[in-house]
Amino acid sequence: MAKKSLIQRERKRQKLEQKYHLIRRSSKKKIRSKVYPLSLSEKTKMREKLQSLPRNSAPTRLHRRCFLTGRPRANYRDFGLSGHILREMVYACLLPGATRSSW
């Protein structure tokens, strides 16, 4: 089980990312726009605006975690579980449609 403080920190990052998502996306779009190109000074202002946003609001700072244990590694996106929890649940027949491999 992951420390509760790490799980809370991750939730805080998710909330910040959702809060600043539109601002970050629109300013990046304006910087990369080829239809309405910005001057160098305008691009610099937009980059400064991006840099002024909280660091934890960047989507690259997010980590997927197992929703049962909070483990940050070996997560399966389809289930939202870490590998060893997924394996235990499959063996206990708690995941419909998932079977042990045998050949």
From Swiss-Prot:
Question: GO annotations under biological process?
Answer: translation
- Where does it live in the cell? Plastid, Chloroplast
The residues that cross the membrane are none
Pfam families assigned: Ribosomal_S14
The keyword Transcription regulation is annotated on this UniProt entry: no
Q: Which domain of life is it from?
A: Eukaryota
Record's SUPFAM superfamilies? Glucocorticoid receptor-like (DNA-binding domain)
Q: Does the keyword tRNA-binding apply?
A: no
Which keywords does UniProt give here? Chloroplast, Plastid, Ribonucleoprotein, Ribosomal protein, RNA-binding, rRNA-binding
Q: Which Gene3D superfamilies match?
A: 1.10.287.1480
Which GO molecular function terms does the record list? rRNA binding; structural constituent of ribosome
Q: What GO CC terms are in its UniProt record?
A: chloroplast; plastid; small ribosomal subunit
What InterPro entries is this protein classified in? Ribosomal_uS14, Ribosomal_uS14_bac/plastid, Ribosomal_uS14_CS
Q: How does it assemble?
A: Part of the 30S ribosomal subunit.
- Function field: Binds 16S rRNA, required for the assembly of 30S particles.
Family assignment? Belongs to the universal ribosomal protein uS14 family.
**What's the protein name?**
Small ribosomal subunit protein uS14c
Source organism of the structure: Oryza sativa subsp. japonica (Rice)
Gene symbol of the encoding locus: rps14
